[in-house]
Amino acid sequence: MSRAFQLFQLAPQFDVDEEQLSRQYRALAAQFHPDRFAAASAFEQKQAVMMTAALNQAYECLSHPLNRAAELLQMQGIDADAPEHTRFPPEFLMQQMQWREALMDAQAAHDEAAMARLDEEIAREQQQLYGQLRGYFAAEQYEQAAQAVRQGRFLDKMRQEIRKAAGG
């Protein structure tokens, strides 16, 4: 089992109870916060710092759907970020070009409303992709899940570019 799932005592699956994850994170972070070990030995202080770092990393992994999917794939021996998973279907490549063109047009026109609409469109695509990932994991279609993770990474990056272009 993945260390991230183990730390939070969660079953390794794509869908997680995000409220439970957040509650457990806060409880564990409070339990192992380095300030609680200020009077402890140097070894115990170092252990607390290391545990806090591990908790933060595990929480980052499990709180983001694509990172969680990549972790599940890693458990199957599949690196979702490997080059063989970068071949996208032609339709997705065309959609990427259309989104980039729409972003450039919106930037050139300083059209924040157009950027917001583009961001909303891509957010809807992300939600559809998360639904596909659920299906791929349920059917144990790990190669398709890896492709979907790569597509999702593009969507994340595109939304970051939109926010940057919009000034936020």
Feature roles, as predicted:
Residues 1-168:
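C-terminal accessory/regulatory regions appended to core domains
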